[in-house]
From Swiss-Prot:
Keyword tRNA processing: yes
InterPro entries linked to this entry: Metallo-B-lactamas, RibonucZ/Hydroxyglut_hydro, RNase_Z/BN
Alphabetic keyword roster: Endonuclease, Hydrolase, Metal-binding, Nuclease, tRNA processing, Zinc
Single Gene Ontology MF annotation: zinc ion binding
Cofactor: binding details: Binds 2 Zn(2+) ions.
Catalytic activity: Endonucleolytic cleavage of RNA, removing extra 3' nucleotides from tRNA precursor, generating 3' termini of tRNAs. A 3'-hydroxy group is left at the tRNA terminus and a 5'-phosphoryl group is left at the trailer molecule
Listed Pfam families: Lactamase_B, Lactamase_B_2
Name of the coding gene: rnz
Name of the molecule in the record: Ribonuclease Z
Summary of subunit composition and partner proteins: Homodimer.
HAMAP family: RNase_Z_BN
Length: 307
């Protein structure tokens, strides 16, 4: 599991930062990539990374401001042009379906793979399978905006091979049956319960990716006990009132959410273009005063998420 930040700027592109897009690489977990937001030029940013459009399985849109969606039609079309055939699902607020349909129709872009668009109308679980589930809550922004909590389900513990070998059980198909939790009878009549030969489960990871938002309770709830919290930091602490007026957060407010939620790690993104060069480091300094394990994303930077 690895983050690749494709765009970390706020509102409009700048020389140093493109607009919002984050790839969550799940190559080991499911051989796929999930994308969060897709601002203009996202597909161009992808060219500089290991992300492959054909591997993008899901796209989660936080809200419908242009700096978060204007790259979506182009990416959907290019995925088809490049031979993508596997299904892709886009999740987002009401209106995302119309945006995609109109953009593809007017440009006569033909997508040759199954494309599903799921409009989120209620908070709660928007996706679940055997490996992950994704929950969402409304944030505090000028238009409807969602944050996403990605939960990896606990992974089954390893088979206690050494314990079986000590008992004289030889490797073979029986090992698989025991790992599947079956009750197995050996040739000598010994009964083995597979559940007694499985180690403790490995706890799954929790990732929280928030859209644009003021400081709010929903952010804390989504980030509770997260291994990684990705939070916007459009403004410095001295501009807290301006952040509030424009429905955004300061770096210090992001750190406060991480602290309250008992998150393990905070990554700041959505940085205003007013912070050019190394001036963005002031945002990092302010956040670390409150939450030490804070990093600030830059375009094309990767962040592994350890188990």
């Amino acid at each position: 599991m690895e983050f690749v930040f494709l765009g970390t700027g706020a509102g409009v592109p700048s020389k140093g930062r493109n607009v919002s897009a984050i790839a969550l690489q799940l190559l080991e977990e499911r051989g796929q990539t999930w994308l969060f937001d897709c601002g203009e030029a996202t597909q161009h940013q992808i060219l500089h990374t290991s992300v492959r459009p054909r591997r993008i399985e899901k796209i989660f849109i936080t809200h419908l401001h242009g700096d978060h969606i204007f790259g979506l039609p182009g990416l959907l079309g290019s995925r088809s042009f490049q031979g993508g055939t596997t299904p892709l699902t886009v999740y987002g607020p009401k209106g995302i379906k119309q945006f995609i349909e109109v953009a593809l129709s007017v440009s006569t872009t033909h997508v040759k793979y199954p494309l599903e668009v799921v409009e989120i109308t209620e908070e709660g679980t928007v996706f679940e399978d055997n490996e992950f589930y994704v929950e969402t809550k409304r944030l505090s922004h000028g238009i409807e905006c969602f944050g996403y909590r990605i939960v990896e389900k606990d992974i089954q513990g390893a088979l206690l091979v050494d314990k079986l070998l000590e008992m004289g059980v030889k490797p073979g198909p029986i090992f698989k049956r025991l790992k599947d939790g079956e009750v197995v009878e050996l040739e000598d009549g010994t009964i083995l319960n597979g559940n007694e030969f499985i180690g403790p489960p490995q706890k799954g990871r929790i990732i929280t990716i928030l859209g644009d938002t003021r400081y709010c309770e929903a952010s804390r709830e989504l980030a509770q006990d997260a291994d990684v919290l990705v939070h916007e930091a459009t403004f410095a602490a001295e501009d807290e009132q301006q952040a509030y007026d424009y429905f955004h957060s300061t770096s210090k407010q992001a750190a406060s959410i991480a602290l309250q939620a008992n998150a393990k790690r905070l990554i700041l993104t959505h940085i205003s273009s007013r912070y050019q060069g190394d001036t963005y480091k002031e945002l990092l300094k302010e956040a670390r005063e409150l939450f030490s394990n804070t990093e600030i994303a830059t375009d094309l930077k990767s962040f592994p998420v350890e188990k």
